[in-house]
């Protein structure tokens, strides 16, 4: 629907769960004008994926990404470092990422939200605690060095990209440009209007003051 109305300069990204990356879905996304895919892998460790309740294995994610690459050149993944039970920064499976043809990779440290299920499990000692901050920072550095080795350069605190594959949405956020987010949990900005989509036809909108807008832009620019 949107495809014919988008310019060559438009970045149209869809975030996919590995189990949703079917051939039929990918064809429809391509036909609809989508030109970039981000797949939430989160971990390459099957035991941790199970604890996360993700519903797939590393091999499922690998096969899904190869399907994505059959339809999209501009495709990347998200990873999380510091999940409880994580024993090291890199495993032999990380070496396989070199063959995936990644255009982009986002690497986030785990944030243990106070009211989350995981935080409750840690408090009840059902789950081990996450690694301490120093360990997590060290592992992030190791992952960053690995990504550089496979051709992904760091261009922002948590983001790495192949040449000319930096995420335009990230740049739009930093520069205070307008962007639109669709789907549950998505955020958008048009001028001084901010909105968040909660799904089920529920959306929060807020118009911020010029001063708040300027402060927001300044803080986001620090991420580079």
Predicted regions located by residue number:
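C-terminal scaffold of the Radical SAM
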Residues: 1-224
């Amino acid at each position: 629907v949107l495809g014919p109305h988008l310019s060559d300069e438009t970045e149209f990204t869809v975030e996919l769960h590995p189990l949703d990356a079917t051939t039929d879905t990918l064809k429809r996304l391509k036909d609809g004008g989508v030109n970039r895919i981000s797949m939430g892998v989160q971990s390459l460790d099957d035991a941790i994926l199970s604890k996360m309740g993700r519903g797939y294995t590393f091999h499922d994610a690998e096969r899904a990404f190869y399907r994505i690459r059959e339809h999209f050149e501009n495709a990347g993944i998200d990873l999380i470092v510091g999940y409880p039970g994580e024993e090291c920064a890199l495993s032999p499976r990380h070496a396989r990422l070199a063959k995936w043809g990644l255009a982009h990779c986002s690497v986030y440290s785990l944030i243990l939200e106070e009211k989350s299920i995981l935080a409750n499990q840690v408090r009840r000692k059902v789950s081990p605690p996450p690694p301490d901050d120093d360990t997590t920072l060290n592992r992030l550095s190791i992952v960053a060095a690995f990504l550089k080795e496979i051709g992904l350069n760091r261009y922002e605190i948590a983001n790495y990209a192949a040449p000319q594959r930096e995420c335009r949405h990230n740049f739009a956020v930093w520069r205070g440009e307008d962007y639109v987010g669709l789907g549950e949990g998505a955020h958008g900005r048009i001028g001084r209007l901010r909105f968040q989509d909660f799904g089920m036809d529920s959306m929060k909108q807020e118009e911020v003051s010029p001063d708040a807008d300027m402060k927001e832009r300044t803080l986001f620019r620090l991420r580079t």
